Structures are given as structure tokens and as C-alpha cells.
UniProtKB/Swiss-Prot annotation:
Name the UniProt record assigns to this protein: Protein rep
Chain's gene name: rep
Keywords from the named record: DNA replication, Plasmid
Presence of the UniProt keyword ATP-binding in the record: no
GO biological process, one term: DNA replication
């Protein structure tokens, strides 16, 4: 649970498989992001950025856990998360929650419909920072149109859509794209099959593009039981349902892609400025068809704007026989210490 250094103890929180949860790394990255928002306030003069910097600095300052007396495992039960879109700490917690929700939804879809699964990636050309926000809006509208086309509606049972943005730092451009997990009828792979060229043509039409976009489509092979514990691991195995869940539930933007290095730089500030503008107050994930229905049936919360303390939905009995473990962020040591 902890390791001692001098007269204080350092927080150690591990998954059931023994992998260490990187609370320290996420908090340090959140504080670095706060420094960038502070610098943006000085550069632009807008209090908006200063307020976000303050929220980031206060994110996860204190963590309260319950420790299971039998296993020794910690379970977070109290914390304050800032929910700033670009916060590395909150992005990590959010991705765990989305992955866990998707695990439950996919298992239920398999049970109810016995469906097949395909993994679709929809892209457009890279854009400059000032074009990122309108480009994402156009993509959202294009996605809506795509799923209104008869060919798609008759072949696909629903969707889970996630937006991801990567940055080409050398060219100073941004690459927004959609990862989409699609449940399909079992006969989809026969007469209803939509080939890659057709998906490409439909996406081009929906987006009204004057070029041919890159579209990737692949079948999700295998129907394995998804292990919730693996959600916290960076699994890069064969393309199976579990891999698809992990792939599609990851962060919309990797924090290391936003802030490079450990110092405030002009390049980093520009990246934070454009990504903050493009992503604030925007839904980055979406469910449709049977997956939306199942999400509602299972009474799952809002993974984007909801509680980031409780990842798993079911109530467990750990709290009954557990005792409290409090961890506090120490700015000098730059780590969580136990009191």
C-alpha cells in the first residue's frame, strides 16, 4: 500500500494484477497543464484561462481511499476532480469510466443480439489550429448524415463514436478523426457487407469533400469475455473485442501530445489554446441505435460530465469492513503522501 521515505509514506495504489496506478504522474502533468493556462492568461489577458489554471492546480489534491482488510487493495471513494477538458488526471479517469461502460454495453449487446462488430476510423485532412473547431463541427454533422444513409441504416445496428485529435508538431497541424465501434447484424458479412471503398465514398459524400479521405474498416475478431481489470492496461494484442474497447475508450487527446516536455513553450501554448477552444463544452463521445438503448437500460451515468470517483457502477461491500486511507499531494516532494 505504501513505501516509507524518511518520516512520511508515499501512496502506492495498484490494480488487482499488481500494476501501479500512476497518480503521481497524472497530478504532475495536471500541474504542468495549469502552468500553461496561467501563461495563456498572461498572454491573452482573459480571466477564463486563469480560472482553469486554478481548477487544474486544485485537481485531486486529496485522495481518500478505502482499504480492503483482506486483499489490501485500495478503492478510491472521495476526491475532487477539476473536469477541465485537457486535464491529464481527469482524462485518465474519464477514459477508465468510458471503457468500463463500453465493456458492460458490449457484453449486453452480445447477449441480446449476438451481433458482430466492426471498427471504423473516419478521417479528414490535417488542419491548422484556427480551422480545428469548425472542422470538428463539420465532422459531427457529416457523421450524422453518414448514419442516415440507407445503406448504413440497413446494415448497422448502432454505434459508439469517439473523437480523437493528434498533432503533427513538425507541420503545426491537427488531425481530428473518429473511432467508431459498430454492432452489425450477423448477415452483415454476407449480402449487407459495406466494402472499404464504399465506406470511403459515403464519408466523402457526407462531408462534401473534394478529395478522397482515408477510411479504415476492420472486423473485430473473436468474442472473448472482457476483463475489466485489463481496462487499465495498455493492451496491444490481436484485434478482439477487448482490444476494440480499449482502443475506442482512450483519451481524445494524449496529454503528451498537447504539452511536450516539462516546460511552458510557445508551441505548447498554441496547442493548448486551439485544443481548449475546439473541445470545450463539446460532446466528444456518442452512442446510437442499440448501444444508446442499452446505455439507457443499464442506467449508466454520464462518463464525460459525471462523477469521476466511482468508475465501476455496481456497489461493492469493501466499505463495510474497510478503513480509511488519506493521501495528500505534497508540492515539495511532488508526490502523494499518506497521513
Amino acid at each position: 500500500m505504501y513505501s516509507s521515505e524518511n518520516d512520511y509514506s508515499i501512496l502506492e495504489d495498484k490494480t488487482a494484477t499488481g500494476k501501479k496506478r500512476d497518480w503521481r504522474g497524472k497530478k504532475r502533468r495536471a500541474n504542468l497543464m495549469a502552468e500553461h493556462y496561467e501563461a495563456l492568461e498572461k498572454r491573452i489577458g482573459a480571466p477564463y484561462y486563469g480560472k482553469k489554471a486554478e481548477r487544474l492546480s486544485e485537481c485531486a489534491e486529496h485522495l481518500s481511499f478505502k482499504r480492503d482488510p483482506e486483499t489490501g487493495r485500495l478503492k478510491l471513494y472521495q476526491a475532487h476532480f477539476c473536469k477541465v477538458r485537457l486535464c491529464p488526471m481527469c482524462a485518465w479517469r474519464r477514459s477508465l469510466k468510458i471503457a468500463y461502460h463500453n465493456k458492460l454495453i458490449i457484453e449486453e449487446a452480445n447477449r441480446q443480439y449476438g451481433c458482430g462488430w466492426i471498427f471504423l476510423t473516419l478521417t479528414v485532412r490535417n488542419v491548422k489550429g484556427e480551422r480545428l473547431k469548425p472542422q470538428i463541427s463539420e465532422m459531427m454533422e457529416g457523421f450524422r448524415k453518414l448514419f442516415q444513409y440507407k445503406k448504413v441504416k440497413t446494415s448497422v445496428l448502432g454505434f459508439f463514436r469517439a473523437l480523437e485529435i493528434t498533432k503533427n508538431h513538425e507541420e503545426d497541424t491537427y488531425h481530428p478523426h473518429f473511432h467508431v465501434l459498430l454492432p452489425v447484424k450477423r448477415n452483415y458479412f454476407g449480402k449487407n457487407y459495406i466494402k472499404q471503398a464504399e465506406w470511403t465514398s459515403l464519408w466523402k459524400r457526407a462531408m462534401k469533400l473534394d478529395y478522397t479521405p482515408i477510411v479504415d474498416i476492420r472486423r473485430v475478431k473473436g468474442r472473448v469475455k472482457i476483463d475489466a481489470e485489463q481496462i487499465e492496461s495498455d493492451v496491444r494484442e490481436a484485434m478482439m473485442e477487448q482490444k476494440a474497447v480499449l482502443e475506442i475508450s482512450k483519451y481524445p487527446v494524449k496529454d503528451t501530445d498537447v504539452v511536450r516536455g516539462s516546460k511552458v513553450t510557445d508551441d505548447n501554448l498554441n496547442t493548448v489554446f486551439y485544443l481548449d477552444d475546439a473541445l470545450s463544452a463539446r460532446r466528444l463521445i456518442g452512442y446510437g441505435g442499440i448501444l444508446k438503448e442499452i446505455h439507457k437500460e443499464l442506467n449508466l451515468g454520464d462518463a464525460e460530465g459525471g462523477d469521476l470517483v466511482k468508475i465501476e457502477e455496481e456497489d461493492d461491500e469493501v466499505a463495510n469492513g474497510a478503513f480509511e486511507v488519506m493521501a495528500y499531494w505534497h508540492p515539495g516532494i511532488k508526490n502523494y503522501i499518506l497521513k
